[in-house]
Every structure is written in C-alpha cells, then in structure tokens.
C-alpha cells in the first residue's frame, strides 16, 4: 500500500484507499426483496431470514447492490422487479439466484423470463405447475413460528389484504386483522387463533395452510391459483355462506420445508 507522509501525518493514496474500501465492502450475499411497504408477507418471504449464506445484507429492488458473491432475489410477487434487476442492477454479483418468486404461465412465456434465465444461475417459482421452472414454495415456511403455534380460540377469523379488501363483506363480531399489521409473529399468532381462516391475502392463505387450519380463500387475482393444492375459494360477497366448505390441506408445511432445503443445498453448491 502506498503511504504518503505529509506534515507528520499518514495519508493513504486515494487510489489505494478506494481499493481498500471496496475490499471491505464485499459481502457474501445480497438478499433482494420488496421492502418499501409495510406488507408482512413481503418482509417475511426473503430466504435470508432462514438460511445461512454467509455475511449478508438486505436490499430493496430500488437500492444499489454492492459487490457480492451471490445475489438472491425473492420471494414474493416480484417478477417484473426481478427482470429489471437481473438485466440492469446485478453486474457486481458473481452468482445470481431467483428463489420462490411468483412466476405465472404468461411470465414464463415472456421475453422477460428468457432474460432472467439467461442472467441467473438458478431460477425457482412459488407457483406450482410452471413448465420448465423449479417449484419452491415461499421460504417463510421455514420460520419456527409454525412449530409452536397456539391452539385455535375462535371458530373463524378474517385475515385481510390491507389494500384489497374494500369489497369484502364483513361479519359482525368476527375477529379481523390485515397484512399491514405488525410482524410475521403477530400475523401467524392471529391466523392460528382461528379454527377456520378466511383470507384474501396470499401469505395469509399460505400460512393458514402451513398451520393446518381450514381455509377459505377470497382471491382478488390469479396468483391464488398456483398453490400445489389450491384452497377452497369464494367470492368477496358470498364468502360468509361458504365458510362451511372450508378445508385444510395436509402436508403443506413439511413439503415446503423439504423443497426449500433442497434448493438451499443447490445454492450452496454454486458458491
């Protein structure tokens, strides 16, 4: 390193100092997911919350990504963000992985998917049945919150999407919470309190199934159609009459954990 002595003080040459800073700025893994809004599912779905991939930092899609050995994008319904990031923003990432992102059949057939596939080392989707794309459910299933969930204290609870529930019929006296309220721990505790869970939230649906609760899903778009075993569904105005049809789906939690662990091992083999 070049050292300059000026007036009795030590100064490092500017060029060498910049190199030194870049060396120490290097992280092992950049986890990139949607962080701009207070959506509990978006914050909970990054695999960085559950898997050890070395020294890491979390970033939103709008942030600059520093030099890193690995960039992990996802999860969440963020396909367009992923296309942009893998095309323009990840030049300093040695390896790139898309983990459990919502990818529809239309997305899969798009030029955007071709760009993602060409720019990434591994690509997976939380959507079941997408041809040519590995199925890996949302990594939030790895949370230990599902291992010690409380027993139900209500017959039915309503877990709503904070921005998509205006047309949702309400039932007087039914406990209700939305996906912009508190942490994942708060959400799972509330969802677990219902023997039956009515929800129009993707993660509300997923977490209720992971908990083994009966679920009645009130979808607002097609992303709810791609679970490995879809829940019973109802419309926003007639769901109270359909509560009796709610069903549980067996094996959702262990299956999700196995598939995430297997994908984690593939990621480890990259680095």
For each feature predicted by the language model, list its residue ranges:
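Active-site anion-handling motifs in enzyme catalytic cores
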Residues: 1-271
């Amino acid at each position: 390193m070049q050292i300059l002595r000026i007036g009795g003080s030590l100064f490092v040459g500017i060029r060498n100092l910049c190199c030194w800073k870049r060396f120490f700025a290097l992280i092992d893994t950049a986890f990139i997911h949607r962080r701009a809004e207070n959506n509990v599912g978006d914050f909970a779905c990054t695999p960085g919350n559950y898997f050890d991939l070395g020294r890491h930092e979390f970033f939103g899609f709008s942030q600059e990504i520093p030099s890193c050995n690995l960039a992990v994008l996802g999860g969440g319904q963020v396909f367009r963000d992923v296309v942009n990031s893998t095309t323009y923003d990840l030049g300093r990432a040695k390896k790139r992985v898309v983990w459990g992102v919502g990818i529809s059949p239309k997305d899969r057939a798009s030029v955007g998917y071709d760009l993602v596939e060409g720019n990434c080392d591994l690509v997976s989707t939380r959507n079941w049945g997408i041809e040519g794309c590995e199925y890996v459910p949302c990594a939030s299933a790895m949370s230990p919150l599902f291992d010690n969930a409380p027993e139900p204290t209500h017959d039915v609870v309503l877990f709503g999407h904070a921005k998509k529930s205006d047309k949702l019929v309400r039932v007087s006296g039914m406990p209700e919470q939305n996906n912009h309220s508190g942490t994942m721990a708060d959400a799972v505790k509330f969802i677990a309190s219902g023997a039956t869970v009515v929800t129009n939230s993707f993660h509300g649906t997923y977490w209720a199934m992971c908990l083994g609760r009966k679920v009645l899903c009130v979808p607002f778009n097609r992303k709810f159609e791609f679970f490995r075993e879809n829940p019973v569904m109802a419309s926003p105005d007639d769901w109270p009459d359909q509560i009796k049809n709610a069903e549980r789906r067996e094996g959702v939690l262990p299956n999700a954990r196995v598939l995430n662990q297997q994908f984690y091992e593939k990621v480890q083999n990259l680095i």
